[in-house]
Every structure is written in structure tokens, then in C-alpha cells.
Amino acid sequence: MTSSTALASLSLAQPLFEAAATVAFALSGLIEAARKRLDAIGVVVVAGLAAFGGGTLRDILLDRRPFFWVQHATWLWVLLALCVAAMLFMRARHFALTERAMQWPDAVGLGLFCAGGTQIALAAQMPALVAVLMGVVTAVFGGVLRDIV
């Protein structure tokens, strides 16, 4: 497989990476916000920071406008629906908000955001080292924001 073929196949998978990573990090933000006993607005803010923070910083550093979540505003509705559904589920099921519950969505989001962020930087004609760094920034910055709040 040539590098252009590999890049093309990654481009086709990009929306799937973004979808799975965004949902996974939104869930990690939801769980962290619930562990801190934040109200509904706080839950949405923390979930949004986790889901969109790394990609937003990546877009700023790569000078991409509009930001991915502005360009695809459906993600905001997905985030709101996910927050409402998760809050209802956690309340009805008395879901245990353990550290272990945070590990799965966090790990999935890290891997997928790193792959997706790297691919976006490569598509923007960035050198390989810069692309890898953009992948790391995309993967970790949302979690950093989630943990700070």
C-alpha cells in the first residue's frame, strides 16, 4: 500500500474516527462532571470541553476555520442529546461513577483523537513530526481541560 493510498483510506475513515472519539470523550467528560456533582449546565460544559477542546486547539494551531464543531454543528446537538440521555440513565440506574468507568471512554478517545488529529494535519500538508504533535495535542488537550474544570 502506497502512502497516498493509505492517506486516502484514512480520509474515508476520518468521520468515523471523529464520531467515535467525540462520543467517547464526551462520555468521559460526563462521568467526570457527575463525579464532581456538577449541575446540568456544568455537565454539558465539561463534556463539551472534553469532546471539542483538543480539536479546537488543533484547528487554531493549523489555522483551520471554521472550527470542526462549528462547521458540523450537528455535533453540538449530539453532545446535548448524549448529556441528557446519560444524566437520565445515571440517575435511573444509580450508575457507579468509579475511576474505572472513566478509563474506557478516555482510552478510546485518546487513541481515536490522536489518529484523527494526525490525519487532519497530514491532509493540511504538515510535516510528519508536526502531524504527530497535532495528533497528540488533539488527543490530550480536551482531557486536560476536563481535568482542570
Feature-to-residue mapping (PLM):
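The first (N-terminal) embedded transmembrane alpha-helix
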Residues: P15-S28, I41, V46-L49
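Cytoplasmic-side transmembrane-helix entry/capping segments in multi-pass membrane proteins
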Residues: I41-L49, H72-W77, L97-G109, A131-M134
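Ordered, amphipathic secondary-structure segments that act as subunit-interaction surfaces
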Residues: L80-I120
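Structural signature of hydrophobic alpha-helical transmembrane segments
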Residues: S9-T22, F67-A81, P127-V140
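Helix-coil boundary and interhelical linker segments in multi-pass alpha-helical membrane proteins
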Residues: M1-A13, I60-V70, G116-V130
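C-terminal ends of transmembrane helices
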Residues: A26-R37, D59-I60, A85-E99, V144-V149
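Juxtamembrane loop-transmembrane helix junctions in multi-pass integral membrane proteins
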Residues: T5-L12, L16, H94-R100
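Short, structured motif recognition centered on aromatic/hydrophobic residues
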Residues: V45-L49, T56-L62, L133, V137, ...
